[in-house]
């Protein structure tokens, strides 16, 4: 099993090492480290204001960390590329929909590919080839809209869509670029309960595609980090939960004041098969454990005590989809 764990570490897609971030005298993140493996769907939870969105912006590259490093690994084993700014290897879906109101759903999804693979001079000087390329991009956009159950809405404009439909289009926008990792920043926070459940089922379908790919010895197509304050969502849609919190025992490490939030929880999620039988008592216990450790601890917590994801992989009973 140890050799399998080492092999998994060779498949790390996102590597965060010792990230610190501050704004003036306000310390936000301290020594944040997290490795995410290809094919994982990881939920990142934490109390409001703990720095989840700051960490996400650092991963995206719009707000680089003050110290530490973030790397995205696109190939096999290796150091990976240091994140210095936004790039195609990272896709992001925000809570607020990033759609052009004057484009249809299909055109919105195809737009990123069109911009990435052509230019205005190319369009003007190579118009016949550009038309052929555009037709191909539109076909791909149609495929990805079908994948998120919007095959019937390709010609709708954002103003004619519900909030859930617009968010599905935003997810398809990210998927079509085939990034190494997709980042979801509270993607369902503004939606009603029924719509949230529908979109969670969509994420579970992506999770199932990862499982199917592993069984067929193919590369899992989706690696996702979803930032959310909803514990049920974090546990339900993924195979791993990480917790970021400022309520840890920083005094024992020699600090007079909190140096920022850090990872205090990192464990596998109990649900393995999207359509399989759920052990609700295990699910409920993990929810209580996360709340005690991340959201409402009885006192300062040892930040390393509940970071046991990699150690738990050594136990065959704790193997999750990441090892399939």
PLM regions and their residue ranges:
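Conserved ABC ATPase "signature" region
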Residues: 110, 114-117, 121-153, 203-208, ...
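Helix-to-loop junction immediately C-terminal to a conserved catalytic motif
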Residues: 60
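The feature captures the beta-strand-to-loop junction immediately N-terminal to the Walker
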Residues: 45-47
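ABC ATPase NBD coupling module
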Residues: 76-94, 124-138, 217-219, 276, ...
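Conserved ABC ATPase signature
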Residues: 157-161, 165
């Amino acid at each position: 099993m140890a050799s399998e764990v080492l092999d998994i570490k060779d498949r790390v897609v996102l590597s965060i090492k010792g990230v610190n971030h501050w704004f003036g005298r306000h310390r936000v993140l301290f020594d944040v480290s997290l490795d995410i493996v290809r094919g994982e769907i990881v939920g990142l939870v934490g109390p409001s204001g703990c720095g989840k969105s700051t960490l996400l912006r650092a991963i995206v590259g719009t707000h680089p960390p003050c110290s530490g490093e973030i790397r995205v690994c696109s190939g096999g084993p290796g150091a990976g590329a240091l994140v210095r700014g936004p790039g195609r290897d990272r896709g992001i879906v925000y809570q607020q929909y990033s759609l052009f109101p004057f484009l249809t759903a299909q055109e919105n999804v195809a737009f990123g590919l069109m911009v990435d693979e052509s230019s205005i001079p190319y369009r003007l000087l190579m118009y016949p080839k550009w038309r052929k390329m555009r037709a191909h991009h539109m076909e791909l956009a149609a495929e990805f809209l079908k994948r998120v159950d919007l095959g019937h809405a390709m010609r709708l404009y954002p103003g004619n869509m519900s909030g859930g439909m617009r968010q599905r289009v935003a997810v398809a926008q990210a998927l079509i670029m085939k990034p190494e990792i997709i980042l979801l920043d509270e993607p369902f926070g503004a939606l009603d309960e029924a719509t949230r459940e529908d979109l969670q089922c969509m994420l579970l379908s992506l999770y199932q595609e990862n499982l199917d790919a592993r069984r067929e010895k193919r590369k899992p197509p989706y690696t996702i980090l979803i930032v959310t304050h909803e514990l049920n969502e974090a546990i339900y849609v993924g195979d791993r939960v990480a917790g970021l919190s400022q309520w840890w025992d920083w005094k024992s490490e020699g600090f007079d004041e909190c140096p920022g939030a850090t990872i205090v929880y990192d464990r596998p999620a109990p649900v393995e098969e999207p359509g399989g039988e759920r052990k609700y008592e295990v699910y409920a216990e993990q929810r209580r454990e996360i709340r005690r450790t991340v959201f409402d601890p009885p006192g300062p917590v040892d930040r390393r005590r509940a970071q046991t994801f990699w150690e738990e992989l050594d136990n065959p009973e704790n193997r999750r989809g990441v090892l399939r």
